[in-house]
Each structure stands twice: as structure tokens, then as C-alpha cells.
């Protein structure tokens, strides 16, 4: 399961860099865990080159922490076999169960589904495996005659699954009579901070978008003993904010330089992120924390992004091989739509009632000011499994 979490986190960083290429100076927010899960449901039925490409993009066939020459790496990827694949699905079953454990301190809901043209019969083995490993099953629908109604039905289903926060996942004209298979996924999270911000301490402050431009934001403030970590290259400082019960954390990476975000994004790798955010690197400080309140909602049609990352065959009617899913010769993935929403406020993410427990560690610790008044990266992490659930870049609240 550890190697699967590593794969998901590596995929998160690779996807973030790819999305950043076409979103310079813009906010980014997505759930890498949700996208990985839903793509793996499709990977369950992929064969041949289609499966190999998907495994590569999802980082399944990468030796964790092992470096080798390009030729050896290429050979090893070709040898990625069925037993590895079955282990991945079994690990996903365990990981999903662990992450989605019922918890009174936060709400985490995921919505994953495949909608397939009803004239394409799915293999019983695929249906059984999908239910066993992912607790889901494909929905047979009539794209040929009722494509727009199906689009509306899918949107309604996702909206229900995410407490009304994810609306209109599939835009107008995104589904038509030629659609054969659509993968949809969304993740909803509502959590309360271990230490909540006092509303009366929130004031209007400038957020510096760059050296010449700033905008007024509602800046929250607290003074607490919190965990800080320092990054030497490029110069940045990180902070960990626990949610109640400490199962989940918000991790913030704040460049020292106002214009340092791009440099930090380019430098970040899974190995470095793991090192920076490890318990060994965390130090307890008396922190004067300034953090903007913000809402982010981002929608992505990931077809072109995932294709450019290396899994183009899955989207090709002539090349896609989903023979593990169905005997139909021209079954291919039409689109992968993803939408994620987050609200950071005094209580936590989303407006939530209740008071956070106060834990006061009565020891003398160094003090530091952490002023998130310029662009930064943030992650929401499931701590027990070390899995990144959400990745975000805040350039302008």
C-alpha cells in the first residue's frame, strides 16, 4: 500500500506540472487521489499498449526511489506484468477502505463512475473486479439516442454525491451520440481545524500577486504552536495545519520570494516533498500565522493533458484496447472530466460548526511569522497512508 501511495503522490506532482504549463499565474486545484482512483478503474479493463501507457502515467511501473538508466527503465516497464496489476487493485481496495473510514471529525466523500454505451456488453470478470476492488459498477446508458439527458443525469448524480458542491461537472455539448465511454470523478471534503481561527481576528489585508500587483483579501490570523519545516533550495518555508483528529493535514509551501512559486514548482519532486514534510524535518514553533480565506473551484477536461503525459491510446478509437472490459472492438475513453472544490475559512474547509480542541504545549519554543500573503502551494494529505488527496496552487484568492 505504501508504494501505491507513492505512485499517487508522484502522479499528483507530474499532473500539477503539466497543468501549470497552460495555467501560468492561475490557481490550480484538483484531487490527485480521486483522479488516480477513477483512472485505475479504467486501467482494470485495459490491455496491451493501452495498459502499459496508463501504468506509466499513473506511475505504477516506476521503482520507488530507484534510479536507473533510460534503457533499463524502458525494459523494466515492458516487463510490468499481470501480478503487479492485480496487486495494485488489491492495494487500492485497502487504501480506499482506510481513507474513507467513517470519522466524526471530518466528511470525505468520493464520486467515481464509468458510463458506457449500453450496446457494449461488459465482461462479468470486469464487473466483479470493479465491485470487489472499487465498490462500483459501470452504468449502461443510451448515448446514441439520449446523450444530453445522460449528461444531465450524470451531473445530478455527482451533485448529490458531493453535498451539492460539485455542480455541472459535464459542460454543455461535452456528450453526444458518438460518445462511447465517460469517466467522471469528484471528491468532497469537509473538515474542522484542530485549532480554529477566531473570526474576530480576520481582517482585510493585501495579498501580493506579484511585485507590482496586490488585491485585498480576508486574512485570518492565529498565534499557536505549530509545525514548521524549512526548504533550502529554492528558499521556502512550510507549515502543517492539522485537522481535528490529526488524520488529515493541510501542508503549505510558501516561497521566500514573492515571485518564487514557479521555481519551487519546477524543483519539487516526490522524493523532495517526502523529505521536506517528514516528521524529522518538522520543528515546533510559536507561529504567528496569517492565512487568507479562499474558495477554489476548478474544472478540467483531462483528455489532452493525460494524452500528452503518455496515455494517448486510451482516447483513440482505433488504438484503445479495453478488451479486459468488453469484447467490443471500438470501445475507447471519450473524456475524463474532473472538478474539485475547496473552501478554507476560520473553522476549516467549508463552513462547519463545532469548536476545535485546544492543546497547549507548555514548553519554550522559537517564534516565527508565517505570512501567506503571496502565491503558495498547498496539499491536503491523509497522514496515516501519506497520500495526497488534494493538490493546490493559490496565485490569487
Curated annotation (Swiss-Prot):
Family: Belongs to the serpin family. Ov-serpin subfamily.
Record InterPro entries: Serpin_CS, Serpin_dom, Serpin_fam, Serpin_sf, Serpin_sf_1, Serpin_sf_2
Record-annotated site: Reactive bond: 362-363
SMART domains, per database record: SERPIN
Gene: SERPINB10
Free-text function comment from the UniProt entry: Protease inhibitor that may play a role in the regulation of protease activities during hematopoiesis and apoptosis induced by TNF. May regulate protease activities in the cytoplasm and in the nucleus.
Tissue and organ expression note: Expressed specifically in myeloid cells and the bone marrow.
Cited Pfam families: Serpin
Motif (Nuclear localization signal) on chain: 74-77
Location relative to the cell: Nucleus; Cytoplasm
Regions that span the bilayer: none
Entry GO terms, CC: cytosol; extracellular space; ficolin-1-rich granule membrane; nucleoplasm; plasma membrane; secretory granule membrane
Superkingdom as given in the UniProt entry: Eukaryota
UniProt-recorded name of the protein: Serpin B10
Gene Ontology terms for molecular function: serine-type endopeptidase inhibitor activity
Taxonomic path: Eukaryota, Metazoa, Chordata, Craniata, Vertebrata
Variant or mutagenesis effect after changing residue 395 to S: No effect on cell proliferation
Keywords for the protein's UniProt record, in alphabetical order: Cytoplasm, Disulfide bond, Nucleus, Protease inhibitor, Serine protease inhibitor
Intrachain S-S bonds: 68-395
Amino acid at each position: 500500500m505504501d508504494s501505491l501511495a507513492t505512485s499517487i503522490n508522484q502522479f499528483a506532482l507530474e499532473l500539477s506540472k503539466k497543468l501549470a504549463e497552460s495555467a501560468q499565474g492561475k490557481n490550480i486545484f484538483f484531487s490527485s487521489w480521486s483522479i488516480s482512483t477513477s483512472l485505475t478503474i479504467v486501467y482494470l479493463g485495459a490491455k496491451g499498449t493501452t495498459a502499459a501507457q496508463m501504468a506509466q502515467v499513473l506511475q505504477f511501473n516506476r521503482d520507488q526511489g530507484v534510479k536507473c538508466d533510460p534503457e533499463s527503465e524502458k525494459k523494466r516497464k515492458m516487463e510490468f506484468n499481470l501480478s503487479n496489476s492485480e496487486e495494485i487493485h488489491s492495494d487500492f481496495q485497502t487504501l480506499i477502505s482506510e481513507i474513507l473510514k467513517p470519522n466524526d471529525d471530518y466528511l470525505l466523500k468520493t464520486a467515481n463512475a464509468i458510463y458506457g454505451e449500453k450496446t457494449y456488453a461488459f465482461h462479468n470478470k470486469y464487473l466483479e473486479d470493479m465491485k470487489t476492488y472499487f465498490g462500483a459498477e459501470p452504468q449502461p446508458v443510451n448515448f446514441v439516442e439520449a446523450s444530453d439527458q445522460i449528461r444531465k443525469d450524470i451531473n445530478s448524480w455527482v451533485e448529490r454525491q458531493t453535498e451539492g458542491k460539485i455542480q455541472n461537472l459535464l459542460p454543455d455539448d461535452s456528450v453526444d451520440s458518438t460518445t462511447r465511454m465517460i469517466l467522471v470523478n469528484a471528491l468532497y471534503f469537509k473538515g474542522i481545524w484542530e485549532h480554529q481561527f477566531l473570526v474576530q481576528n480576520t481582517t482585510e489585508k493585501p495579498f501580493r500577486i506579484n511585485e507590482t500587483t496586490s488585491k485585498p483579501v480576508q486574512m485570518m490570523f492565529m498565534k499557536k504552536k505549530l509545525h514548521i519545516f524549512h526548504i533550502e533550495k529554492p528558499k521556502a518555508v512550510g507549515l502543517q495545519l492539522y485537522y481535528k483528529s490529526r488524520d488529515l493535514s493541510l501542508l503549505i509551501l510558501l516561497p521566500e520570494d514573492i515571485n518564487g512559486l514557479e521555481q519551487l514548482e519546477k524543483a519539487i519532486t516526490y522524493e523532495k516533498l517526502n523529505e521536506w514534510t517528514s516528521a524529522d524535518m518538522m520543528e515546533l514553533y510559536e507561529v504567528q500565522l496569517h492565512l487568507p480565506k479562499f474558495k477554489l473551484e476548478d474544472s478540467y477536461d483531462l483528455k489532452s493533458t493525460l494524452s500528452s503525459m503518455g496515455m494517448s491510446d486510451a482516447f483513440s478509437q482505433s488504438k484503445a484496447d479495453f478488451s479486459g472490459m468488453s469484447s467490443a472492438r471500438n470501445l475507447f475513453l471519450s473524456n475524463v472530466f474532473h472538478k474539485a472544490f475547496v473552501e478554507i475559512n476560520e473553522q476549516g474547509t467549508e463552513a462547519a460548526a463545532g469548536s476545535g480542541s485546544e492543546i497547549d504545549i507548555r514548553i519554550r519554543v522559537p517564534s516565527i511569522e508565517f505570512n501567506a500573503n503571496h502565491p503558495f502551494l498547498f496539499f491536503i494529505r491523509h497522514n496515516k497512508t501519506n497520500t495526497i488527496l488534494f493538490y493546490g496552487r493559490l496565485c490569487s484568492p
